[in-house]
A protein has these predicted regions:
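Phosphate/pyrophosphate-binding loop motifs in nucleotide- or prenyl diphosphate-using proteins
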Residues: 1-177
């Protein structure tokens, strides 16, 4: 486990920051934008978790309790795992091009495939869509819509950055969006 003993260094006061290998880049560097957007998605997933756990087990109209519990269960298992994967992805993206340390935990094809399998399974539980869904709904749903739009921004930023990125990382974010 990583132990952080100091949360400030002053090293970024001049507008630069460090990559994983210790090399310095401007905070305006495309790689730093990508890492920051990945971090933003992770924070939004934390908001989704918080909002889902605030849901009552019953609806004000006496509606289906199973649905609310299912949302909580899915959020706590799937989103918790996604947060860990996004943390790993952010670390990978904070490496200089083609300089990923051997010890680093990386997103792989099984992670990308699992996303598709989970989405297919969840989709089977839903009624077919007849149109696009407007971003609204309960707290966790609205937060998930916001996370989805930031994931799409992350994907666009990754495509714009290009250099040294593993194709599976881009595929994973595309599937996540």
């Amino acid at each position: 486990m990583v132990r952080i003993t100091k949360v400030h260094t002053g090293g970024g006061d001049s507008g630069e920051t460090s990559l994983v290998d210790g090399s310095r880049v401007p905070k305006s560097d495309a790689r730093i934008e990508v890492v920051g957007t990945c971090d933003e998605v992770n924070a939004l997933f934390g908001l989704v978790l918080m909002e889902s756990n605030r849901l009552s087990d019953t609806h004000s109209d006496g509606g289906n309790r199973v649905t609310t519990r299912r949302v909580k269960d899915v959020c706590n298992s799937a989103i918790g795992r996604l947060q860990s994967e996004l943390f790993d992805l952010g670390a990978e993206l904070a490496c200089p091009p083609d300089q990923i340390p051997e010890y680093m935990q990386l997103i792989d094809q099984k992670d990308s495939d699992r996303l598709c399998d989970e989405m297919d399974a969840w989709n089977e539980e839903l009624q077919p869509l007849e149109s696009f869904i407007l971003p609204s709904g309960s707290g966790p749903i609205a937060a998930m819509h916001l996370a989805r739009t930031v994931i799409r921004r992350l994907e666009r930023s990754m495509v714009a950055m290009k250099d040294g990125m593993r194709p599976i990382s881009l595929q994973y974010v595309n599937r996540l969006s």
